[in-house]
A protein has these predicted regions:
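Active-site-facing substrate-recognition patch
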Residues: 1-53
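PRPP-dependent phosphoribosyltransferase catalytic core
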Residues: 2-3, 9, 132-174
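Short glycine-rich phosphate-binding loop at a beta-alpha junction
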Residues: 53-60
């Protein structure tokens, strides 16, 4: 069976989570299948295998799960982007808008060099706000974003619009 079919079949729908009317796409069954998880991370890395990626930036927290093995496969440095106050050294910060209010992301100030060629990895592309803020953070730090790789894209939330002009790869869409 093709990988996309295996992933779609394995992701669990959880109705009314985290609130009524929402159908949550639970990726933990994908993580629970070691062979499938390996295939997924290999497939997330493959489109960027010849792009001279120097750094992989993963978005807290599920992006870390996929990002670490993808970074290893690409021979790239792993850089976590975290919620404020979680990183111990000097940090750069990027604020972004939410439906009601703002949030922020941080990255160590010395995590990237001026010639860093970066792949961003996360589990889900929804509205694109977090991913767009991560792109801005990387570019402000002197890096260039080669692309973004997601396990899945929720197309009905139009996250690709927030990342217009960026290379986006995903294994499945809903």
């Amino acid at each position: 069976m093709p990988l996309t079919d295996d992933v779609k079949r394995t992701i669990r729908d959880v109705p009314d989570f985290p609130k009524p009317g929402i159908v949550f796409k639970d990726i933990t069954p994908v993580l629970g299948d070691a062979a499938l998880f390996r295939r997924v991370t290999e497939a997330m890395a493959a489109p960027f295998a010849h792009d001279a990626i120097t750094h992989l930036v993963a978005i807290e927290s599920r992006g870390f799960i996929f990002g670490a093995p993808v970074a290893q496969q690409l021979g790239a440095a792993f850089v976590p982007v975290r919620k404020p106050g979680k990183l111990p050294a000097a940090r750069q910060r990027e604020e972004y808008s939410l439906e009601y209010g703002t949030d922020a992301l941080e990255m160590h100030a010395d995590a990237l060099g001026d010639r860093a060629r970066v792949l961003i990895v996360d589990d889900v592309l929804a509205t694109g706000g977090t991913a767009a803020a991560t792109c801005r953070l990387i570019e402000r730090a002197g890096g260039s974003v080669a692309g973004l790789s997601f396990l899945l894209v929720l197309e009905f939330l139009h996250g690709r619009h927030a990342l217009a002009g960026r290379r986006i790869e995903s294994l499945v869409t809903f």
